[in-house]
Every structure is written in structure tokens, then in C-alpha cells.
Amino acid sequence: MELIIILLALGLLMFTAYRGFSVILFAPICALFAVLLTDPSHVLPFFSSIFMEKMAGFIKLYFPVFLLGAIFGKVVEMAGLAASIAKTIVRLVGAKRAILAIVLMGAVLTYSGVSLFVVVFAVYPFAKNMFQEANIPKRLIPGTIALGAFTFTMDALPGTPQIQNVIPTSFFKTDIYAAPWLGLMGAVIVLAAGMLYLESRRKKAQASGEGYGGFDSQNAPAPESIESAAEPDKSPIRHALAFVPLILVGAVNKYFTIYLPKWYPNGFDFSSIGLKEFGRLDISSAAAIWSVEIALVIGIITTILFDWRSVFAQLKEGLNEGIGGALLASMNTGAEYGFGGIIAALPGFHKLSSGISHTFTDPLVNGAVTTTALAGITGSASGGMGIALSAMSEQYLQAIQAYNIPPEVMHRVISMASGGMDTLPHNGAVITLLAVTGLTHRQSYRDIFAITLIKTAAVFAVIAIYSLTGLV
């Protein structure tokens, strides 16, 4: 019965999200419905101490990132960078390769350490312009951004600084370059299969006469796109400079990620300036977020300098729109985190995670299935991985020693598995992506789910490759 309660709450949230209802309202309703069926007396304590704590904690940490990311994306659009870069890339790779261009743009940003939430805000203006230029249906944008930002650069490519690749290092005493060949092969599988799928969807839409805005827009881009954006100078230098803010965001983020902890080697003690009530701040936990925020501020300033007249002409409307988008996206994602927190606290969840973890004898398969299942249930790659490793890491270490499996292989498998079924309809990144693009689950989730299946299958392909070749 306890398992049925969890599945019922999860199914209800997926259904309401798919039907277009706001998860800000339905995430707590679905979560508390599960608590009500478990023990009615726990409803109010769970709401105050778990749901609201999780939601508020997420917003406290990440709202500045959402806000600056949304403003950066909007300023990029207002300054004409989106139109300029879109035209340049279309000219280089061809209009028919707009999908590949957006995938690679998202991949470069996430691999450079930019948060995938920021990538959604930053890449969407480019995707919108490029898809309009190539007359590719807008409904394919979420799947395209998902392939570039939510898959191989998040957890497969060795060296990626995303949290899904960092968490296993503390459990398996590895580094972020663990199992490089397996990671590279997994990345190639996801990229190749994902591109084949998205291109097949593009060709099918083209054959049926569907354009950017649907079946009534077979001709040129929508009027609000490239023609109405600030028209960039036609000189090659001007086009090249349009890439500078995007590159700066990645480079500055990397720089401050390395050097901020060195500037505060002992953290920051507020009592040293007479503010004892705030205690000591652990810089290691804040440096990653600070780095992104600084990088985005520099990116915004650089973008404004690119064409300050165009930006200031639309500044009020653009800022208001960006702030509104950031509020909606952060509240949506925070509500989903609160839902995951309540589900993870229910008695049925512990039975479920324990049951899954004891189903498979092979430690790699066991770890992959457990992690991806928990990521799917909680709607969070890092959340599912954290729960799996906190409960099972010692058992996994003993098992891989018994099977003579290097810990680096387990690291890569667990990392990739966390990014498997995490992108179900209630996932925060999915909800943010759809909110930013102005699309619904009904319009675009099919393609996101196809990418979800591809990246989940890639984990087991990597396990098979290791089992057959022993390659690490």
C-alpha cells in the first residue's frame, strides 16, 4: 500500500503537469495527498518542515542564478546577439543543421560549468532565432536544448564540472575524469542517437508542411524574430564579437570556481566583523553559485556594451519580462524540490529504494537501476543519486571489490544513471525549460521523453561495453 501511495502521487503530478496545470499548486497538493493517505496527522508538519523547507532552501540558493540567467538571456536578445549568432551559425553549418548548432551551444556551456538552468535561459534566444531562420517547428526547441544541456555534458563526458559528476567523487574517492573512455563512448552514443531522433522529427515536420509556428507558417520566420531584433553590423568582426559574452560566461565561471576558495581559504567568519549571529560561512558550498552569478553579471554588462542603444530602448519591458520568467521558473522548480523531499521522507520510499537495490546482483546494473529509478521518482538527478549513494555506497564499494570493478567505472555508471529517468514530466529542469520556451508538456514533452529514453539506454550500453572489453 505504501508503494502504491507513492506511485499514485507521482502519477497524479505527472498527469497534471502534462495537462498544463501549474506545479506550483499541484506539487504540494500531490505530495500532501500521499502524506494524507499515509498518516493524516502528518500533513501539516510535513508541509511546514519538509515541503516548505526544501522549496525555500532551493529558492534561497538558486533564485539569483535564475534571475541573472533570465536577464542575461533577455539582454542577449535585445542587443541583437541572438540574431547575429544565429545567422553566423546558420551560415557556417547550414540552415538544416540548426538543431546540431543549438545542441553544441548548450553542450559547450554546460561543459564549461554553467548551470543547466542558466543554459536554458541563455540558449533559448539563439534557438528561437535559428529555428525561425531555418523554419523548424518551435515545439522541437525543448528537446534540442535538453539534448545539449541535460545529457552527455551533464554526466558522461570526463571532466564535466556539473554536480552530477562531482557527487560520486566523495563516495568512491575518484575525480571528475573517472573512466574517460567509457564516458566518451557514452557521450557519443547519446549525441548520435539524439541527433538521429531530432533530425527525423525535423524531416517529418518538413514533409508535412509544418513550419516554426505550425502549419500556418510554412514561409519565412515570424516577424518578431530576426528582422525586429536589433540588426547587427554586417562586418565579420561584429559577428565574431557577438560570441564574446557567451564565451566570457563560461570562462569567468571557470576562473572564479577555481580562485574563490583560495581567496577565502578559511571560509568567512561573520563574528570577526561583529555579526556573531550569522556564524561562519563555508565557502566551498557557496563558491560554485557565486562563480555563476559573477559570470552572468559580467556577461550582462558585456552584452549591453555590444549595443547599448538597442538594449536601453527596450530595457524596462525586457527586464520585467526576464524577471517574470525567473520568478515562474524558480517557483516551479522549487515546488518540484519540495515534492521530492516529501516523497523521499515517506516510509514507502525507503522500502522502494531498498527493494530496487537488492533486485540485481551485478553491482553496475544494480547501481544504475537504483539511481535512475530514484532520480525518476524524486524528479532530480542529484537528488536520486544522493539518496542512492548515501544509503548504498558502502555496499557498492564492497561489491565492486568482489567483482574486481574499478571504482572509476562505478562512478561513471552512477553519474550517467542519475541523468537517465530524471527528466520525467515533474522534473524541475523540464518544467523550467517549458516555461522559458512558452510551450506545454503536450506540445513538446514527447521529444524530451525520447531523449530521456536514449540517455537511460546509454548507461546500460556503457555497462555492456565495459563487461565485453574491460575498457575504462
UniProtKB/Swiss-Prot annotation:
It comes from the Bacteria. Residues 220-229 have a biased composition (Low complexity). Keywords: Cell membrane, Membrane, Transmembrane, Transmembrane helix, Transport. Residues 209-229 are annotated as: Disordered. It is found in: Cell membrane. The chain crosses the membrane at residues 4-24, 27-47, 56-76, 99-119, 140-160, 176-196, 240-260, 286-306, 323-343, 372-392, 448-468. One of its GO terms (cellular component) is plasma membrane. GO terms for molecular function: gluconate transmembrane transporter activity. The keyword Cell membrane applies. It is a multi-pass membrane protein. InterPro entries: Glcn_transporter. Belongs to the CitM (TC 2.A.11) transporter family. This is Uncharacterized transporter YxjC. It comes from Bacillus subtilis (strain 168). The gene is yxjC.
